[in-house]
Amino acid sequence: MKISIYATLAAITLALPAAAQDGDAAKGEKEFNKCKACHMIQAPDGTDIIKGGKTGPNLYGVVGRKIASEEGFKYGEGILEVAEKNPDLTWTEADLIEYVTDPKPWLVKMTDDKGAKTKMTFKMGKNQADVVAFLAQNSPDAGGDGEAAAEGESN
C-alpha cells in the first residue's frame, strides 16, 4: 500500500512540469485579467501588451528570468530570500504554476523557512497552466517569441 502511495505521489510530481507545457496561452490571456490588477506585461521598448497595475512586477519575460530580478521593483522579504539562497535560479513554467497556486508554500519550500512571507496574497485555484503558457509566450528567453510585443498589440 505504501509503495502505491509513493508511486502516485512521484507520478504527480513528475507530471507537474508537463502540465505547464499543456497550458493554452489564448485561455491564459483571458485568465490574466485576474492578474492585471497588480501586474502588467510591458515589452522592453515600452509597448504595453497588457496594461495593468504596478503593485506586482512587470511579467514580460518572467519565464526564464532570474527570481526577484525585475529592475526597480521592490520585492518582499520571502522572494528576496529565495533569490539570495539560489542566485542562479530562474522562473520555470513549473515553478510559476506552483507559485501562482499558492505563493507561501513555494516560498517555504525554496527557503526552508516556515516563517517566509510573501507580498502576493492572491491564490489561483485553476487555469494556472494556461496563464503560465501565456506568460511563456511573452518571455523570449523561455522560447516565447514575444509575438504580441512585436506586433504592437495593446490591451
From Swiss-Prot:
Binding-site residues for heme c, renumbered to this chain: 35, 38-39, 120
InterPro entries: Cyt_c-like_dom (IPR009056), Cyt_c-like_dom_sf (IPR036909), Cyt_c_1A/1B (IPR002327)
Any GO MF annotation of the entry: heme binding
Processing after translation: Binds 1 heme c group covalently per subunit.
Top-level division of the source organism's lineage: Bacteria
Propiece residues: 150-155
Residues recorded with modification Pyrrolidone carboxylic acid: 21
Leader peptide range in chain numbering: 1-20
Key words, A-Z: Electron transport, Heme, Iron, Metal-binding, Pyrrolidone carboxylic acid, Signal, Transport
PANTHER family: CYTOCHROME C
Protein name, per record: Cytochrome c-550
Organism listed in the record: Paracoccus denitrificans
Gene name linked to the record: cycA
